[in-house]
Amino acid sequence: MSLHTENSQPSIGVYPGTFDPITNGHIDIIERALALFDTVIVAIAVNGQKQPLFSGEERKEMIEKCFEKEKGRIIVKIVPSGLLVNFAVEQGARAIIRGLRAVSDFDYEFQLALMNRKLVREVESIFLMTAFRWIYISSSLIKDVSKNGGDISDLVPKHVERLLEEKYRP
Protein backbone atom coordinates (compact mmCIF):
# COMPACT_ATOMS: atom_id res chain seq x y z
CA MET A 1 0.00 0.00 0.00
CA SER A 2 1.47 3.35 -1.00
CA LEU A 3 1.10 6.73 0.66
CA HIS A 4 -1.17 7.79 -2.21
CA THR A 5 -4.82 8.55 -1.61
CA GLU A 6 -7.46 9.19 -4.25
CA ASN A 7 -7.66 12.90 -3.46
CA SER A 8 -3.94 13.57 -3.43
CA GLN A 9 -1.07 13.75 -5.85
CA PRO A 10 0.80 10.51 -6.47
CA SER A 11 3.42 9.97 -3.78
CA ILE A 12 7.03 10.17 -4.88
CA GLY A 13 10.12 9.04 -3.00
CA VAL A 14 13.72 9.68 -4.00
CA TYR A 15 16.29 6.95 -3.37
CA PRO A 16 19.78 8.43 -3.86
CA GLY A 17 23.10 6.66 -4.18
CA THR A 18 26.11 6.24 -6.40
CA PHE A 19 25.02 2.71 -7.41
CA ASP A 20 28.52 1.90 -8.70
CA PRO A 21 27.30 -0.79 -9.27
CA ILE A 22 23.76 -1.51 -8.13
CA THR A 23 23.60 -4.52 -5.79
CA ASN A 24 20.86 -6.86 -4.65
CA GLY A 25 20.76 -4.81 -1.44
CA HIS A 26 19.87 -1.68 -3.42
CA ILE A 27 17.27 -3.61 -5.38
CA ASP A 28 15.67 -4.85 -2.16
CA ILE A 29 15.36 -1.28 -0.84
CA ILE A 30 13.86 -0.04 -4.14
CA GLU A 31 11.31 -2.87 -4.25
CA ARG A 32 10.27 -2.19 -0.67
CA ALA A 33 10.05 1.55 -1.36
CA LEU A 34 7.58 0.76 -4.16
CA ALA A 35 5.23 -0.57 -1.49
CA LEU A 36 5.30 2.88 0.15
CA PHE A 37 5.29 5.20 -2.86
CA ASP A 38 3.53 5.36 -6.21
CA THR A 39 6.81 6.36 -7.85
CA VAL A 40 10.41 5.90 -6.77
CA ILE A 41 13.04 8.10 -8.38
CA VAL A 42 16.42 6.39 -8.23
CA ALA A 43 18.80 9.35 -8.09
CA ILE A 44 22.31 8.55 -9.26
CA ALA A 45 24.53 10.90 -7.33
CA VAL A 46 27.70 12.30 -8.81
CA ASN A 47 30.18 12.34 -5.94
CA GLY A 48 33.28 14.40 -6.67
CA GLN A 49 35.19 12.52 -3.96
CA LYS A 50 34.65 9.14 -5.63
CA GLN A 51 36.06 7.87 -8.91
CA PRO A 52 33.27 5.65 -10.25
CA LEU A 53 34.03 2.50 -12.20
CA PHE A 54 30.92 3.02 -14.34
CA SER A 55 29.82 6.26 -15.98
CA GLY A 56 26.56 7.86 -14.89
CA GLU A 57 24.90 6.67 -18.10
CA GLU A 58 26.17 3.10 -17.62
CA ARG A 59 24.78 3.07 -14.08
CA LYS A 60 21.46 4.46 -15.31
CA GLU A 61 21.14 1.71 -17.94
CA MET A 62 22.19 -0.92 -15.38
CA ILE A 63 19.42 0.15 -12.97
CA GLU A 64 16.76 0.52 -15.68
CA LYS A 65 17.46 -3.04 -16.83
CA CYS A 66 16.78 -4.28 -13.27
CA PHE A 67 13.33 -2.71 -13.29
CA GLU A 68 12.06 -3.06 -16.86
CA LYS A 69 8.73 -4.40 -15.56
CA GLU A 70 8.26 -1.38 -13.30
CA LYS A 71 8.76 1.25 -16.00
CA GLY A 72 6.79 4.33 -15.03
CA ARG A 73 6.89 3.54 -11.32
CA ILE A 74 10.68 3.58 -11.13
CA ILE A 75 12.40 6.50 -12.79
CA VAL A 76 16.19 6.66 -12.93
CA LYS A 77 17.86 10.06 -13.09
CA ILE A 78 21.43 11.28 -12.92
CA VAL A 79 21.51 14.06 -10.34
CA PRO A 80 23.60 17.09 -11.13
CA SER A 81 25.66 18.56 -8.32
CA GLY A 82 23.75 20.40 -5.64
CA LEU A 83 21.65 19.63 -2.61
CA LEU A 84 19.72 16.39 -2.81
CA VAL A 85 16.83 17.88 -0.85
CA ASN A 86 16.45 20.57 -3.54
CA PHE A 87 16.40 17.85 -6.21
CA ALA A 88 13.68 16.05 -4.22
CA VAL A 89 11.58 19.24 -4.13
CA GLU A 90 12.06 19.77 -7.88
CA GLN A 91 10.80 16.21 -8.49
CA GLY A 92 7.74 16.70 -6.28
CA ALA A 93 8.99 14.09 -3.82
CA ARG A 94 7.65 13.76 -0.30
CA ALA A 95 10.58 11.77 1.03
CA ILE A 96 14.21 10.81 0.66
CA ILE A 97 14.65 7.07 1.14
CA ARG A 98 17.82 5.70 2.70
CA GLY A 99 18.87 2.14 3.35
CA LEU A 100 20.64 1.35 6.60
CA ARG A 101 23.01 -1.62 6.90
CA ALA A 102 24.41 -1.02 10.37
CA VAL A 103 24.23 1.32 13.32
CA SER A 104 27.28 3.12 11.94
CA ASP A 105 25.25 4.08 8.84
CA PHE A 106 22.62 5.65 11.08
CA ASP A 107 24.97 8.24 12.62
CA TYR A 108 25.82 9.71 9.22
CA GLU A 109 22.31 9.37 7.79
CA PHE A 110 20.76 10.96 10.89
CA GLN A 111 22.95 14.06 10.43
CA LEU A 112 21.93 14.31 6.78
CA ALA A 113 18.26 13.86 7.64
CA LEU A 114 18.40 16.63 10.24
CA MET A 115 20.12 19.02 7.83
CA ASN A 116 17.64 18.21 5.05
CA ARG A 117 14.78 18.77 7.50
CA LYS A 118 16.23 22.15 8.46
CA LEU A 119 16.54 23.14 4.80
CA VAL A 120 13.15 21.84 3.59
CA ARG A 121 10.62 20.83 6.23
CA GLU A 122 8.21 19.29 3.71
CA VAL A 123 10.60 16.51 2.66
CA GLU A 124 10.87 13.62 5.11
CA SER A 125 13.72 11.15 5.43
CA ILE A 126 12.64 7.52 5.54
CA PHE A 127 15.06 4.83 6.67
CA LEU A 128 14.61 1.24 5.53
CA MET A 129 16.68 -1.47 7.15
CA THR A 130 18.59 -3.54 4.64
CA ALA A 131 17.36 -7.13 4.52
CA PHE A 132 19.57 -9.32 6.69
CA ARG A 133 20.91 -11.37 3.78
CA TRP A 134 22.31 -8.22 2.12
CA ILE A 135 23.49 -6.38 5.22
CA TYR A 136 27.19 -7.04 4.64
CA ILE A 137 27.44 -6.03 0.97
CA SER A 138 28.36 -2.69 -0.51
CA SER A 139 29.20 -1.57 -4.03
CA SER A 140 32.84 -1.10 -2.99
CA LEU A 141 33.06 -4.63 -1.62
CA ILE A 142 31.38 -6.05 -4.74
CA LYS A 143 33.94 -4.29 -6.96
CA ASP A 144 36.85 -5.53 -4.84
CA VAL A 145 35.65 -9.14 -4.88
CA SER A 146 34.92 -9.03 -8.62
CA LYS A 147 38.27 -7.42 -9.42
CA ASN A 148 40.04 -10.23 -7.58
CA GLY A 149 38.09 -13.01 -9.29
CA GLY A 150 35.65 -13.81 -6.48
CA ASP A 151 32.11 -15.08 -6.98
CA ILE A 152 29.50 -12.29 -6.80
CA SER A 153 26.79 -14.15 -8.71
CA ASP A 154 24.32 -14.13 -5.81
CA LEU A 155 25.01 -10.50 -4.83
CA VAL A 156 24.21 -8.62 -8.04
CA PRO A 157 21.96 -9.19 -11.07
CA LYS A 158 23.51 -11.27 -13.88
CA HIS A 159 23.86 -8.31 -16.24
CA VAL A 160 25.76 -6.38 -13.56
CA GLU A 161 28.06 -9.35 -12.97
CA ARG A 162 28.81 -9.45 -16.72
CA LEU A 163 29.50 -5.70 -16.83
CA LEU A 164 31.94 -6.01 -13.93
CA GLU A 165 33.70 -8.89 -15.67
CA GLU A 166 34.02 -6.75 -18.81
CA LYS A 167 35.58 -3.90 -16.78
CA TYR A 168 38.04 -6.08 -14.89
CA ARG A 169 38.76 -8.84 -17.42
CA PRO A 170 38.26 -7.35 -20.90
Curated annotation (Swiss-Prot):
Substrate binds at T18, K50, L84, R98. Its EC number is 2.7.7.3. The record marks H26 as: Transition state stabilizer. It holds the Pfam family CTP_transf_like. GO terms for cellular component: cytoplasm. It comes from Desulfotalea psychrophila (strain LSv54 / DSM 12343). Homohexamer. CDD domains: PPAT. This is Phosphopantetheine adenylyltransferase. The gene is coaD. Keywords: ATP-binding, Coenzyme A biosynthesis, Cytoplasm, Magnesium, Nucleotide-binding, Nucleotidyltransferase, Transferase. One of its GO terms (biological process) is coenzyme A biosynthetic process. ATP binds at T18, F19, H26, G99, L100, R101, E109, W134, I135, Y136, I137, S138, S139, S140. Pathway: Cofactor biosynthesis; coenzyme A biosynthesis; CoA from (R)-pantothenate: step 4/5. It is found in: Cytoplasm. It catalyses: (R)-4'-phosphopantetheine + ATP + H(+) = 3'-dephospho-CoA + diphosphate. It is an enzyme of class 2 (transferase).
